[in-house]
Amino acid sequence: MDNRFATAFVIACVLSLISTIYMAASIGTDFWYEYRSPVQENSSDLNKSIWDEFISDEADEKTYNDALFRYNGTVGLWRRCITIPKNMHWYSPPERTESFDVVTKCVSFTLTEQFMEKFVDPGNHNSGIDLLRTYLWRCQFLLPFVSLGLMCFGALIGLCACICRSLYPTIATGILHLLAGLCTLGSVSCYVAGIELLHQKLELPDNVSGEFGWSFCLACVSAPLQFMASALFIWAAHTNRKEYTLMKAYRVA
C-alpha cells in the first residue's frame, strides 16, 4: 500500500471517529434548542401547576412548550428539561430575594410521543393533523440513529479492509459515510424547519428568546466531517485500485 493512500486512510479514520463521537454526543444530550426567560418566582401556585402538567403523561405539545418557554427550557431528541426553583413553597410566598437555588428537571419523550401526530393548532386535537410537522419530527430523531448505524457498519467494513490489507473494500465504507452525512444533514434540516414551524404556531412570550444549543452544533459539525471522511475513503480506494491495475498491466506487457 502506497504511503499516500495509507495516510489518507488514517486521516479518514480519524475524521470518522470524531464525527461518530460528535453524533453520539448530540443524540445523548438535551441541548438541541434552548430558551432563555426571566427567572420565575418560586412561590406561586402557577409554577406547581405548570410543573405537574409538564411531567404528566397526558402533556400535549402546547402544555410542555409553555413550560419550556417559561422556565428556561432545553430540548433534545429524547428529553425536555426545565429549570425550576429548588425549594417550592406552596403554602405561602416567601420574601423575594435577589436569587434562589434552581434545579434542572427533565422528562423523557416516550416512543408514543415521538410518533404522535402534530396538530395544526398545537394542543387543539380538533384542528386537524399537521402532516409536515409530524414527519419532520419523526425524521429529526430517526435520521441521527440511521447515520450512527451507517458509520458503525462502515467501520466494520474498514476493519475488514485492514485485516485483508486491501483498500478496495473501503469504497463501501466511503459510500456508507456519504449516506450517513446525508442523514445527518437531513436531520439538522428537519430540526430547523420543525422549530421554525413550531414558533409560527406558538409565538415566544415577551422577554423570552430561543437559540440552537451545542448539541445541535455538534450534529452540524458531524455532517461535514462525515463527507470529508467519505471523500478520503473513496479517493484512496479508487486511486489505489487504479494504480494497481495499471501496474499489473505494465508487468504483463
Curated annotation (Swiss-Prot):
Stated consequence of mutating residue 249 to P: Found in a patient with a form of Pelizaeus-Merzbacher-like leukodystrophy; abolishes localization to cell-cell borders
> What is any Pfam family matched here?
Claudin_2
What tissues express this gene product? Widely distributed in the adult CNS with highest expression in the corpus callosum, caudate nucleus, cerebral cortex, medulla, putamen, spinal cord, substantia nigra and subthalamic nucleus. Weak expression was detected in the adult heart.
- From the Swiss-Prot or TrEMBL record, give the protein name: Claudin domain-containing protein 1
Q: Top-down, what is the taxonomic lineage of the species of origin?
A: Eukaryota, Metazoa, Chordata, Craniata, Vertebrata
PANTHER family the record matches: CLAUDIN DOMAIN-CONTAINING PROTEIN 1
Cellular component annotations (GO), alphabetically ordered: apical plasma membrane; cell surface
Membrane-spanning segments? 5-25, 141-161, 175-195, 216-236
Has UniProt tagged this entry with the keyword Cell membrane? yes
Q: How does it sit in the membrane?
A: Multi-pass membrane protein
Q: Which residues form a coiled coil?
A: none
Q: Say which species the protein is native to.
A: Homo sapiens (Human)
What does the similarity note say? Belongs to the PMP-22/EMP/MP20 family.
* Domain description: The C-terminal region is required for localization to tight junctions which occurs in a TJP1/ZO1-independent manner.
Q: Which UniProt keywords apply?
A: Cell junction, Cell membrane, Glycoprotein, Membrane, Tight junction, Transmembrane, Transmembrane helix
In which domain of life is the source organism classified?
Eukaryota
Report the locations given in the UniProt record.
Answer: Cell junction, Tight junction; Cell membrane
**Glycan-bearing residues:** 42, 72
